[in-house]
Amino acid sequence: MGTNNDYRLKPSFGDSFGTGWRVMGDNFLRLFLVVLVVGILTGPTKMFHMNFSSSDFPHFPWIWHGHMGHEFFNLASLGLLAGFFILLALLYSFLVVPVIKYGSKMIFIQAVRKIKPDFEWLLKGFWENYLNIILANLLVVALVILGFIALIIPGIIIGCRLAFVSYLVMDKKLDPIEAVEQSWKLTRGHGWTIFFMGFVSIFIVIFGLILMIVGVFPATMWISSSFASLYQAVLNEKEKPAELIAAQA
């Protein structure tokens, strides 16, 4: 972490996106590969958004043509099939995807710290810190949903204040409760910065999609690098060495 000063790490909107751009440029191929792999590994959850009808499976054994009440049995069979796929999607979304996404965030932190990104982080969470990752993700999702139910704005506030949970779980090996509490402390005074960065990120992704879709890869890389830069900048601010604090006094 002694090379952090190579980048302009200040917890502001402009500095975070500016540093994120530099980080992306310095590690383009490696971060591109990370984003590509994450997209492939998290993509299966989108495969389960299907619309079934009995006409799609005319020769399957559960199609009860010619039997009394065959329409009911057809619908029931398709319902069970759809339920099975939905269950698979939920299990994959909550037991696999968070590990991959949390690992990718650690890779972006390494890039910000000028450490050679280690691709093993994409899967390392399955044998290291797995339970903390899964529980932290569930806790954050539950808190944000409760906030949105409470009138939307609380959900946005909670989402912004818990933006560092995934970084803290991977970087500091904190448990879910500690990560939530620490993220809340670290983001104090930076909530608006996180909100505006998230808001602008939406338009960056849209612009990337407009560029023949392929632009979404550098857009995602830039956004991820920028948030990792913000996290590191806030961390540096909160963890200043004692001698530096004494010198500034």
Task: Please place each PLM-identified region on the residue numbering.
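Hydrophobic alpha-helical membrane segments
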Residues: 1-249
